[in-house]
Structures are given as structure tokens and as C-alpha cells.
Amino acid sequence: MSTGAFYISSLLEKMTSSDKDFSPKSLGGSRVLDPLPWLQILAAITDWISGDRTQDLALPRFMATSDLMSELQKDSIQLDEDSERKVVRTLLRLLEDRSGEVQNLAVKCLGPLVGKVKEYQVENIVDTLCANMRSDKEQLRDIAGIGLKTVLSELPPAATGSGLAISVCRKITGQLTSAIAQQEDVAVQLEALDILSDMLSRLGAPLGTFHASLLHCLLPQLSSPRLAVRKRTVVALGHLAAACSTDLFVELADHLVDRLPGPRAPASPAAIRTLIQCLGSVGRQAGHRLGAHLDRLMPLVEEFCNLDDDELRESCLQAFEAFLRKCPKEMDPHVPNVTSLCLQYMKHDPNYNHDSDEEEQMETEDSEFSEQESEDEYSDDDDMSWKVRRAAAKCMAALISSRPDLLPDFHCTLAPALIRCFKEREENVKADIFGAYIMLLRHTRPPKGWLEAVEEPTQTGRNLNMLRAQVPLVMKALQRQLKDRNVRTRQGCFNLFTELAGVLPGCLAEHMTVLVSGIVFSLADYSSSSTIRMDALAFLQGLLGTEPAEAFHPHLPTLLPPVMACVADPFYKVAAEALLVLQELVRTLWPLDRPRLLDPEPYVGEMSTATLARLRATDLDQEVKERAISCVGHLVGHLGDRLGDDLEPTLLLLLDRLRNEITRLPAVKALTLVAVSPLRLDLQPILAEALPILASFLRKNQRALRLATLAALDALAQSQGLGLPPPAVRSVLAELPALVSENDMHVAQLAVDFLTTVTQTQPASLVEVSGPVLEELLQLLHSPLLPAGVLAATEGFLQALVGTRPPCVEYSELISLLTAPVYNQVGDGGPGLHKQVFHSLARCVAALSAACPQEAAGTASRLVCDARSPHSSTGVKVLAFLSLAEVGQVAGPGPQRELKTVLLEALGSPSEDVRAAAAYALGRVGAGNLPDFLPFLLAQIEAQPRRQYLLLHALREALGAAQPDNLKPYVEDVWALLFQRCESPEEGTRCVVAECIGKLVFVNPPFLLPRFRKQLAAGQPYTRSTVITAVKFLISDQPHSIDPLLKSFIAEFMESLQDPDLNVRRATLTFFNSAVHNKPSLVRDLLDDILPLLYQETKIRRDLIREVEMGPFKHTVDDGLDVRKAAFECMYSLLESCLGQLDICEFLNHVEDGLKDHYDIRMLTFIMLARLAALCPAPVLQRVDRLIEPLRATCTAKVKAGSVKQELEKQDELKRSAMRAVAALMTNPEVRKSPSVADFSTQIRSNPELATLFESIQKDTASGPSMDSMELS
């Protein structure tokens, strides 16, 4: 026998020992006991000494059971079959032990034991517990109930693939049903109902075979004379409703509705309350299934809400809340009545005279059903009106969150009522009233900058203006409450004001006196917990960020002392929050980009003393250390010129923190703040020591430290310049070549920026490192992934190298280094390097030419020669043309005369890369000399139709690079030429023409944009689609002066969605998608008219499907596929930027259609469905049974025999995308209760291929960011 088995055996022997009087032998030798057994032993010793030995001590069994509990909780324990049987038998016997302590320990052992024994032993445990529940002994029944709950809670969930939980639950369901049905013993009924509720909440769907019997067993219990039974039955029915079949749900709903009497019919108040409470429970657990029954339910519930019964009113309002949250679409006709009832009962307080100043303290307990509530909860002496008011407030919050489209009405009706109710005397109710108003604020928050939203004549702007009018009323209502003795009230005020300031920045400035008074009151409140001080500090910090600095100036003498006291607070969280506030105060009141309007002299000493005291302390929490360092950085950076003799000690303290490994990162950031300060402080006392320390940080693996260090070094180099000690600078420069690498582009960019600054301030220091740095930099330029920021930094560095006097590196040497990899290429197998590398090298050549204009003409001439030489390789020609595109504009007219001929010849090159580079150069060079080049370019487009595509590309570049004023003389000629080519049969040509038209419109938008009307009305189909495509190129993601004019024409352009031509409709959808994605404000107000047309384009049109014969095979072609795909892409973009304007139920109808469409569209809709599951869980839940079927069909689809590899890969990707949507749906616990989802989940677990795929997707979701967005424009 192993040591573990022997130990278990010895424990079992002790657990079965008979009771004895206490003796030293019962201690089990000299083993060390846990604290709990020692307490038992101490009590036993006391009784024994006193002579009372009749008590059942049972110490050996108790201690052995405790030891067994410890063993079972170890992962390493393994029981053989014999040990399993003995342990189970012994523990079940101990459940009947005379000692209550032994019983309690034994039942606790059952939890960990479940995972250590075989299934049949678990079933044995469950059988015994069920039998004990029917025992005549009350204590045994209680312990059996606890045991069953313990076992059920420890069973592995069905989602893990284990069938144990399901088999155990099926085994006991029948016994629970019979226990509930028998009326003799209420205690057994209650215990069985509790266990059944727990089972249904965890494993409702897998118990489908029992649902009918459970329903028929539970429904009669709604009429039980015992309140506790009725309440537990209501909870169980709620869980059952979420998991049962549609037929059973309809039966349950019909039962509840049919038994609701008419409001004037005689009925038991208790029976009505129970039925309404059951409706509320079903609404909370399965409200998405109640939508079809609401038209019958709501009139009855509304009538009952008017009866003189506060408990019934509360239940009705709770039911309304559930209905609003779970089926908002179906509640639409009932919203006015619900709103009226909420307004009526939110002020329902018949037992209180509001004119009195005396506030009554009342018990505030949760009214939600739970098994702990007792039958006498609703005593005649209880004032239930506060629960009615709280239910009304919660219902109002649900109303606001479920119907954001009614915000204007809510601001007129709900907002004033909520503000009046801020004086509510009951704290729980007041918290929910605050919550409802905060919900209104959050939905009023505009989706973009608030200032633009206020000025915009849309509904959002009107909502914000209505909110602004409410601010004085809110302030008046909350003025006294900011100093309320109740902490929770003040916290609610701070939360509400924080949200208000975030929605409407600046609106609290004129009320600052009241707010500061309230903040100071809470900061000085040491009688309550520190939480209120932290809340007050957090509110103050937010206020400093949203309100103008001038509003704080008069209040600083009042505000600063309590903040300083909090900085010195012994509790680290308060101190950390106070330091953050102090930092914000400094940054807001004495900004560096504006003149000082407030003299800092009276305050700077106090702030410096308090902060440095925190910084010098050595026993601080890490968060306080970091905040103190940051605060010192802001203090020195903003007010260093007023610190006087304290400046140098403060800098030395920062230097000391720079040496400490724990504080070095915040110290580096603080040093950066000091260095970038326009105060130009003298940092000489620390520079010689700080630079080598910073240099050492560049070798660390901590990326954040390297980035912060490079930023600090660049700031120091810019601010101190020649003041930096050259030896220290060289020590830093020695670390830089290793950082100029494509391994981390951001680090490389900062390193090059620092090199540029050093080159400009201390060029002599670069002598030793310029070679290695240039070598790494040139290697970096060969990366095809080079970001624009790194390229711009490289250009600046190269310009700095040739800009010093004398230059650090000669111009010719740098040009040679840049072009050598291309010029030295052996053979002519094509360009060689990646296309993007040529553009990067060309940009650098142009940057050098711009820095040395005297060299530009010579460089351009050499490039022209290289471009026209028959001996030049393709790579050399491409680089020459791309360089000429950049250099030609600054090279002067000399080389340009010869350049025309060279570029035109190159358009006929056999190399596509050379032709594209020549076209690009022709346009860019022409932009610098429009009078000479543009007429020539237009003439060539007319004369050379075979080169038209390349010449149009050149025209596009010229229009994009030239100044608008310089283009005005040529507008009419270019316009005419472009519209002559709108009917080109080549789609690529039409697309380039559209882009040219878009760029041309920017020259004179008010004159040219209205011309589109004529073209759309009279043009041919190709012309109309080209015009609409051109509109797409007028939309950018940045604000532009054309936006207001464009917005006035959008409605007319969108009428093209009704164009009979497919290409025009597709172009219109593409343009609409670009607008929604980049500038949704252009189309938001038109969605009511656009969406029906958009949805129409998602339908499959049979008249557009045709068969094409390809040899012996027939191939189906769907001409409408591209239009449908464009429509679904628009729908996805609308989810991201216009969610509030969508009717999600209607939206889901078309998503549902897309789930059965073509491969490309299904891929789109799977992504949309995953997004909707996160954004709009309630509507998705309502139709999950319909959504899951196409997903199941996709996941279980079989590939046809003989399919090619491409088909197999497409099917695998489709299956993976569908499974991602399934995984996203299943993140909602309520979705998992759906019978159809539970059935599919079982199917996934039983199929090894699907199970593996599902597990891999879940791991991917857990380890990486989800696909929250998709670029479609």
C-alpha cells in the first residue's frame, strides 16, 4: 500500500471511531493542529476539567475529517477504487453523525471529492443525498440539501465536454419533482426548489427531456399558500423559461396571462402579485422570448400597476424594466404608458411630508428574489413606497438605455422629473435616480467633438442645448447634497457632475463656487472612510480637465490647503490621488503655451514642500513614488523659474531617483518634462551624471524605458545644446547604431530624431559614430515596411548632415551611399529591391537636393542621363524617375526641357515598373511648372490614346501636387478632357478619371461641385458611375473646407441608389461606405431615407443570375453579387459609426439573409454577427434560434468529393469564420441557455474536428484582441 493510501486509510479509521471522553490520546500524538481544531480541543478541555463529560466531543472524527478535507484539496491525491469506495461510504455515514461539527465538515468534503472519484461513486453520493432529503429528521434533510448544492456546484460544466453533470442532474430531477409535488413538508419543498433553480441555471438546456414534467410540477406551486414556496417557484420558472422549448414557453406564457384576472375582477392580491412577479422573473431570464406575448400582457400589467398595492406596483415596474431591456422593439407601442407610470411612481411617497426638514431613516434592502428572503418580509408595518420609487427609477434607466432615439422627448419629460427627485430621502432610491440621470447623460454624449456637435443643426446638437439648459436646475438641486452627511449621496453627486462635465465641457465653470465648497467639505471629512476623499480628488482632477483654468483662479486659496493635506495623508491611495490632482492643477493653472494669468508666487513654496516631502520618503508605496516624481517633473517644468534656491536640490533628487531601478522610468519621464519646458532651466548640475545613466538605459530590454530615454535625450539636446558635456554625449551616441534597426521602428525613429538634434547642436560629437549609424540607417531604408515617420526622420537627419558648416558628410558621398545598392546591382532581372524602397531612396535624394539647392540642377541632369542611357538597368531607371519626380520641382527649368522627351520615351518602355515611375515623374515635375507641362500633358492625352492610362496617372499626380490657385486657368480644359473619357470601357481608366475629377473639384468646389447634378441627370451610365466615384475622392477622414458644401449635395448623390444601372448603384454604395467610414456626419441625418434603399440591395435578384457555358460545363454567374457585397460592407461600417441610428431588429433581418448568401457575403455577415453579439446582445438574443441554424449548416457542411485545393481552403476559412461568430454569441450566458444553441454546443463537443476548431478559436480570442473593426472602404 502506498504512503498516501495508508494515510487515507488511517484517517478513515479515526473517522469511524466511537465517541470517547477527552483524553490526551485523542490529540493524535504530537501533530500540529489547525486553529479550528485547537478551539474545539480548548472547549473540550474546559468541559472535562469542570467535570461535564456528557457532551459528545467526537474529536478524533472531527480532526480526521479535517485532515481528509486538506488531502482532498490537493491536486496530487489519487485514490484507488477501494479507497474511493471507503471514503464515499465513510463521508455519507458521517452526514448522520451526532456531532454537528463533524456533519458540516463531512458535507464540505463532498465538493472536492466529486472531482477525485469515478462517475458511479458520484451517482451513489447523489442517490444517498436525495434519500436523506426525504428523511424525518430535519437536521439530516438540511445537511442533505447543502450536500446536493455542494456537489452540483463542483460538477464540471457541460461546456467542458464532461457528461457527468448532465447524467447526475437527470438522475435527481425526477426525485426533486416528486419532492416539490408533495405538499406535506414545506421544508423539503423549499430545499428541492432551491436545488432545482440551481440546476436549471447551470444546466437548463441539457435537461430538455424533463422540462415538460418540471413545468407541470412548478405551475401548481404558484398557488401555494406559503409565500416562500411561491417565491422559489417563481425563480425556478424564470430559469426554466430561458431553456425550455418554444412550445413549453408558450404554454407557460399562456398560463400566466390566462390566470391574470381583469383589474376589476375579484382575485387574491397575493395570487396577482405572484403572477406579476413570475412575469418579471421570466422577463429577466428569458425576456427575449416574451415579445410575441407583450400585446396581451402589457395592458393587464399596466392596469395592475394602478391598484393601491405598493408591492404589486413594484413588481409591475420591475416587469416593465425587464421587458424594456430584453425586447425593446416589441415594447415600442407601450413606451408612452410606461413613461407615464414611471413619472407617476417616482414621486410616490404617501408617508412623508416633503415640506419637513426631518429625514426618516429606513431599511434599504434588495427586493430581488432570493432564497434567503423570509415569509414575513412584507410586514404591514413596512413602508413599501420607497421600493416603488426605486423600481420606477430603474425602469426609467432601462427606458433611456433601450430607446436612445427618444432622447429629445426624455430631455423634455424625464430629465426635469429626475432633477426634482434628487431630493429623495431614501439613499437606495436616490442612487438609482442618479443612475437614471447619468444614463441620460451618457446617451446624450455626442459621438464626436462636443463643440462641433453643439454647433451642428442636428438632433445631437439640440440634445446638448437642452442639456445645457438643465445645468442650473441640476446645480440648484444638488447644492445642499454636496455637503450631505451621507457619503453615498456625495459620491453620487460627484459621479453625476463628472459625467455632466464630460458630456458638456465648460458648463460647470459658472458654478465653481458651489462645487469647490462641496469638494473641500469632502476632502476635510476624516470621520468617514477615505473613499469619499478619493472620490472628491478624482472629481476635482476631471474638473480641471474640462473647465477653463480661469474658473479656478479665485478658489485656489480655498482649494489648495486640503489638497496639500491629502498629499500628506498616511493612506497611500489618497496621497497618490492628491499628487495627481496637484499635477493637474499645475498644468492647468500655469500652462506653458499661454501667458500666466495667475501669480504662482503665493503657492509654489507650499506645493514644492509637500511634493518633495513625499519624494524624499523611502518607505512609500510604489504608486505614490511614481506620482510624486511625475508631480515634481510638472512642478519644475511649469514653475521652475520660481523655485529659486530649491531648484538645484530638486534636480539632484530627480537624479537620485534616476539611479534607482524601481523609479527610473518615471524619473526619465519627469526629466523629459523639465527638458522640454520653454523656461530653459539650467540643468548643468545634473547633466554630466545624468547622460551616462541615460546611455545605460538604452541597453536595457525594457522597451518603455528605451522609448522614454530617447525622448528625454532628444529634449535635453534641444534645450541644452552646447551645454551638454561632449564626453557624455559621445557615450550616448555609442549606443545608437544598435537601435537604428527594423526590429523596432518606433525606437529607430526616436533614435534618428535624437541624431538629427545632436547633428544640429554638436556636430563634432558625431565624428566617431556617423559611419556605423549611416550603415544601419541605409540598411533600414531598404525595408519595405518603413513607416512614414521613420522616413521623415531619416530625411531630416540627412539634411542635417549636409547642412552643418563644414558638413559632417559631403553631399556627393551621401548621394553615392543612397544610390549604390541600385547602381551596383548586377544584371537586369527587374528592379531587384521592393517598390517601396525605391520611393524611400528617391525621397532621401530629394531631401538632400532641397538642403543643397546649389547641387539640385546637377543632380537632376545626372538623373536624366541615367534614365535615358540604354545601359542603365531597370532599377536605375526606376530610381532615376522617382528621384526626378521629387528633385525636378526644385532643379530649375534647365533639366526640365530635356525631361519631357525622356519621360515620354519611357512611357513606351517594356518594363511596367519603368512606365509607372515615368508617369509618376511626369505628373510631379509638371506640378512644379504648370504653364509648360500641363498643356503639353493634355495634348499628349488627346494624341496618344494607347498611352492614355499612364498619361491620366501623370495628370492625377499633377492635379494632386499643384497649388489650387495655379490650376484655376486650366480648369475648363481639364474638366472637358476628363468627361470625354468617362465612357471608357476600361474600368481602371474610369477610376483614374474619377480620381482626377475629384482632385480638380478641390480647385473651386462651389463652382464645380454643382455641375455633377447635370452629369448625373443627363450622362450615360458609365459617366454617372464615374461621377459618383469622383465624389468618393472628395471625402477624407480629416475636416476639410469642402465638407459643408458636400453635405448639402449628399442627398442628391444618394438618389443614385435608385439608378437602373448596376455599376452606378455599386459606385454609390462604395461612396456611401466611404462617407460612413471616414465622415459619418455627412450622412447621419439621411439614414432614414437611405437605409430602405440600402437594404433593398442586399436581396438576391434571380433576374441577375445567368448561366454561362464554358465548353462542356455550365457556370452560374450572379451579376448582382458585387452590388450585394458592397451593400453588406456598408452595413458593417454603419455598425461602427452610426449604431444609434439603426433599427437593429430590421438590420438583423438582412444579416440573417446574408448568412445564407455567397461565400464573400457570408464571411462579412459572420464578422457582423460577432460584432452585433457584443454591441447589441438583447436583439441578437431574441432571434438566436434563427441565427444559429445557418451557422450550424456552415460548420457542418461537407466539401464535395474531388474539390480542388482552393475550394477546400475557402471552405475551411468559411467554417472558421462561422465558428468565430458562434464563439462570440456564446460569450453571452443567456445565449447558451437557448435549446438550439445548447444542442449545437453538444454537437460541437461530440465532433472532434469541430471541438478542436472551437477550442483553438476560444484560445485565440483569449490571447489576442478581437476583430473589432474591419477596413472596407
Curated annotation (Swiss-Prot):
Pfam families named among the record's database cross-references: HEAT, TIP120
Residues covered by region (Disordered): 352-383
Organs and tissues of expression: Detected in heart and skeletal muscle.
Keyword Isomerase applies: no
Location of this chain's protein in the cell: Nucleus
Subunit structure: Binds TBP, CNOT3 and UBE3C.
Protein's name in the database: Cullin-associated NEDD8-dissociated protein 2
Organism annotation: Rattus norvegicus
Name of the gene encoding the protein in the UniProt record: Cand2
